Each structure stands twice: as structure tokens, then as C-alpha cells.
């Protein structure tokens, strides 16, 4: 090989190596690994696959620092964690009813009820923690840039069967759980965008990919979600008055931070009455 050929080969190898390095660091393949943009893309991909646990992990990595995605990731995290808490509560409530209906074998239903409530509590606590961080920001309007969730808002048939005390086969149970959780996430998103129990409206609102919601409306929606999530800790369920009070207090504080409306006034009255009732136990 001539000296010129050797130099040419060396330069070619250097160019290839440089290209590979650029490709692995981002380039045409997408955002560089470890950046907020990388985790934002990952959150979208895992959300589309209904891997909600991984989606939350990606969002938590984003919200760990202040960056261009933080505000959007935090509101998505609120919608997602509140929705999952709702989904697991629905599962727990259905199996609790099943334990009462199935007198010959209530133990299995009670175990499921307990396990679902443990999961509901985990996501409820993640929700209230994320909300505390959100309240430190003063974004107005609030950015909502998450994709419209897949799934259906229709009641899951298998839950009706479980509520009646019918034992679900494993082939029925796992798909039913996924549908219930997807439904919870869908309804959580509807609540966040101000389209409670109205998926078509929520889908239309989220179509732009960069919805801006007045802070008053979003905080009011979160107050509702906080109060709903707190029901997990009432005397009929987990029976933890301290945690119940935390959720109710957060909801009341949220309502105090926005201008009073007929909706906020009614919700404040409802929460206050609920707290007084709890104090009697």
C-alpha cells in the first residue's frame, strides 16, 4: 500500500468513527441519550405502548431538573398518576363488592382488594407529591402537551362480573386490569383538560399537541382529583385519617389559590363537610 493510500484509509476510518459517534449521540437517530428531550421522546413511546410505569419513570427524569420540558412533563405526570390511582381504586372497589357477594370464597377477593389498594395508594402519593411541585410554579396558562390516551371510557364488563362475586379466569383478569387502568388514565386526561367524562372533547383539545389551559381551570380539576384520590383513605377503605386529611387539605389549598366560582364553592363545601365527618371517628 502506498503512503497516500494509507493516509486515505486512515482518514476514511476516522470519518466512519466520527459518524458513528455522532449517530450514537443523537444526530439523525433522535435526541442524545440522557437529555430531557430523550426522556420526553421515551415517554411518548412508552405511553403509546400503555407502559405507564415506564412513562412515569421517563417523566420523573425530566422533572428532576428545570428544563424546557419540565412544565409539560409535570402536568402529564399529574394526569397519569391521578388516572392510575383511579383505575386501581375501581379495581379494588369491584373486588371488595365481590367479596361480599361471594360468601363461599371471599378470601381471594379480599386479597385482590388489598393488593389493588396498595397500588392505588402508591400512585395517589406520587400524584400528591407531583402536585406539590407543580404548585411551586406559577405557569398561567398551564401547558398540556401529552398525547390523547388509547382505550375506552366504557365500563369494563369483567368488573361487573367481579362485583357480583364471579371468579375471573387468569385469561380474563389480566386483560381486564389493563383495560381498567387505561380507562383510568383516559378519564384522568379528560379531567386535566377540563373535559370531565367527555373523551371526544378531550381528544379534540389535545389534537394540537400543545394545549394551553387557564391555571384556574387546571387547578380546580386537580382539586377534584385530589379529593377523589383521598377517598382511598376514608374509614370504609384503607382507613388512614392522616393521609385522608393530607389530600383534603391539598384540595382546599388548591381551591383557595384560584378565584371563587360556583364549582369551587360547592367543592370546598363538600370537602369541608367530609373532613368534619372524618373528625368524628
Q: Model-predicted segments: where are they?
A:
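Amphipathic alpha-helical repeat scaffolds of TPR domains
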Residues: 33-44, 74-101, 125, 129-235, ...
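Bacterial signal peptide processing site
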Residues: 26-29
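Bacterial N-terminal signal peptides that target proteins for export
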Residues: 1-14
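C-terminal motif of bacterial Sec signal peptides marking the signal peptidase cleavage site
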Residues: 21-24
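Alpha-helical segment of the N-proximal tetratricopeptide repeat
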Residues: 35-61
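TPR-repeat structural position
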Residues: 52, 110, 117, 179, ...
Amino acid at each position: 500500500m502506498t503512503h497516500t493510500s494509507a493516509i486515505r484509509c486512515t482518514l476514511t476510518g476516522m470519518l466512519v468513527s466520527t459518524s458513528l459517534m455522532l449517530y450514537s449521540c443523537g444526530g439523525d437517530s433522535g435526541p442524545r441519550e440522557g437529555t430531557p428531550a430523550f426522556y420526553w421522546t421515551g415517554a411518548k413511546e412508552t405511553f403509546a405502548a400503555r407502559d405507564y410505569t415506564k412513562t412515569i419513570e421517563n417523566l420523573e427524569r425530566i422533572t428532576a431538573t428545570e428544563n424546557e420540558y419540565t412544565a409539560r412533563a409535570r402536568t402529564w405526570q399529574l394526569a397519569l398518576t391521578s388516572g392510575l390511582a383511579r383505575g386501581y381504586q375501581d379495581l379494588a372497589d369491584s373486588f371488595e363488592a365481590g367479596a361480599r357477594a361471594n360468601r363461599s370464597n371471599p378470601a381471594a377477593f379480599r386479597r385482590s382488594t388489598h393488593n389493588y389498594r396498595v397500588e392505588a395508594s402508591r400512585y395517589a402519593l406520587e400524584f400528591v407529591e407531583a402536585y406539590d411541585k407543580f404548585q411551586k410554579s406559577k405557569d398561567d396558562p398551564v401547558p398540556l402537551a401529552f398525547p390523547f390516551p388509547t382505550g375506552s371510557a366504557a365500563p369494563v364488563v369483567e368488573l361487573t362480573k367481579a362485583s357480583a362475586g364471579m371468579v375471573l379466569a387468569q385469561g380474563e383478569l389480566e386483560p381486564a386490569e389493563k383495560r381498567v387502568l387505561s380507562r383510568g388514565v383516559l378519564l384522568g386526561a379528560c379531567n386535566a383538560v377540563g373535559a370531565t367524562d367527555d373523551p371526544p372533547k378531550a381528544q379534540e383539545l389535545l389534537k394540537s399537541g400543545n394545549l394551553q389551559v387557564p391555571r384556574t381551570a387546571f387547578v380546580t380539576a386537580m382539586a377534584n382529583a385530589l379529593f377523589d384520590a383521598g377517598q382511598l383513605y376514608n374509614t370504609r377503605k384503607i382507613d388512614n385519617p392522616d393521609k385522608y386529611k393530607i389530600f383534603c387539605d391539598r384540595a382546599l389549598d388548591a381551591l383557595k389559590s384560584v378565584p371563587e366560582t360556583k364549582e369551587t364553592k360547592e367543592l370546598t363545601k363538600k370537602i369541608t363537610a367530609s373532613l368534619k365527618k372524618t373528625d368524628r371517628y
